[in-house]
Amino acid sequence: MKKIAISPGDLAGVGPDICIKAFKDLSKTSTPVFFGDPNLFEHRAKSLNIDIDIREYEGEDDLIQDKFYVKSYEFNSKITPGYPTPIYADYLIEILKEATKLNLSREFSALVTGPINKELINKGGIEFKGHTEFLAKESNTEKVVMMLANEHLKVALATTHEPLRNVPSLITEDHISDCINIINNDLQDKWKINNPNIKVLGLNPHAGDG
């Protein structure tokens, strides 16, 4: 099965807990590798009363399916769940950069990112608008579109992480056209939808009035 890289997100948030709780289901369809401190995952698993057998991931392909593989990045400061702090902002970005790099090199087939506190990272002295913009920069991709998707519905956003007052000026004919082209191409190429049916919603609730 394909290997997927998973960054847990905010160390003091629910991300590590979600990783641990979702591990068994994830392992049915893929081979997950979690990026972070093994001690953090072990501590959180104990607090959840969930048994996991942690193994350190070292780049191998023949992973044992029921083992909890961690690409190890030690973090020596104390983490208290529910109390986020900017002291680990650099650490979060380091993990994201490494996970992104290994995906771009095809060592992994996908990257899953846990919930992250953008304000916390910015308070740590790092400019961070969101995962979408971060991944675009790391992959040298000029134009990207964020999509929320499940098997029944896919919703793409024309703008992301922008103050509402700035949005009207960003909704231009060229920008919407670029978004539609990206969505159309990826629905056909990555989702194997031969003739995508794309609906465009207006910013103004009366945009459809005659």
Labelled PLM ranges:
Residues 56, 70-72, 146-149, 157:
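Structural signal for conserved beta-strand scaffold positions within catalytic alpha/beta enzyme cores
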Residues 148-179:
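Ligand-binding beta-strand-loop-alpha-helix segment within the catalytic cores
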